[in-house]
Amino acid sequence: MFDLNTHVARLLMDEPFFAILSRQIEKRKTSSIPTAGVRINKETAQFELHYNPEFFEGMTDYQKKDVLLHEFYHCVFEHVTGRLPVNDKGEKEMTMMWNIATDLAINSHLSHLPDGCVKPGVGPYEEYPNEQSAEWYYARLQQDAKDNPEFGEAM
């Protein structure tokens, strides 16, 4: 059975920078999502890490660590708060395209993610360079969706 706290503790021994952040994130086990994700709870204004324990089953410890780093980086880089793109109404909004852009930005720095994670240079992002900002990837995704409607429909 997967115990998130064990793997968070291992991560913090290697990466103490994330200790304060980890204590501020509510961790919620759920089967309502297939993987893991962070969000802001609008009622409490706190970060929440939602995770499906089945997603972590069968991963190596290195993969589990990189998935946790991936989620923590979303908080550190303000991907779910201040840097959200502005929609047509002038409101900041989380979109699938922004989520993919932020995943590309983070994942280009992580080498032990499980198969299936979006990465620059792989699959539909084969022509995307590594180590760009989320905003860079977002602009590229928008342009690719404009140039190729089928690409945009996948978002």
State where each predicted segment sits.
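Short, functionally important secondary-structure microenvironments
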Residues: 1-66, 72-155
